[in-house]
A protein has these predicted regions:
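Charged interaction scaffolds used for protein-protein
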Residues: 1-8, 23, 31-38, 58-117
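Short, isolated positions in well-ordered beta-strands
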Residues: 14-16
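Short, hydrophobic/amphipathic alpha-helical patches that form generic packing surfaces
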Residues: 43-54, 79-86
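Short acidic/polar mixed-charge low-complexity motifs
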Residues: 10-12
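Residue-level signal for threonine
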Residues: 19
Length: 117
């Protein structure tokens, strides 16, 4: 989750980014990666608004819509938002650093054992 978008609109600076909670909020609003890939035009405004959740949660939807309508190079914007979401999903599989305090786990086979005579 390294990629961020910095923008200024009407002299107000914004830092758009995602974290796991903002993506969960997006998913609760109906977002899915598969639908975004299939129908980006139907989902881009939701994805753009979702990027405000982490740092600018109280920004009104009307302001977000206005910012989106005034943003140039929307193709690059969509690519960057998709990358940011991908990074957030990938972070689920990040391995913890070091060994101290990490949870240990193993697979236990509980299927019945059969004996052969």
């Amino acid at each position: 989750m390294n990629t961020k978008i910095k923008l200024t609109y009407k002299d107000v600076p914004y830092v758009l980014e995602y974290d796991r909670m903002s993506v969960k909020t997006l998913e609760a609003s109906g977002f899915s990666v598969e639908e975004f890939v299939k129908k980006p035009m139907s989902n881009i405004e939701l994805v753009f608004a979702g990027a405000f959740i982490k740092n600018h949660r109280k920004t009104k939807q009307t302001v977000i819509d206005e910012i989106f309508s005034k943003t140039k190079d929307k193709e690059k914007l969509v690519e960057t938002l998709a990358l940011m979401i991908e990074e957030t999903y990938s972070s689920l599989f990040d391995e913890p650093e070091g060994d101290e305090g990490n949870a240990e786990w193993e697979v236990v086979d509980l299927s019945p054992k059969t004996s052969h005579k």
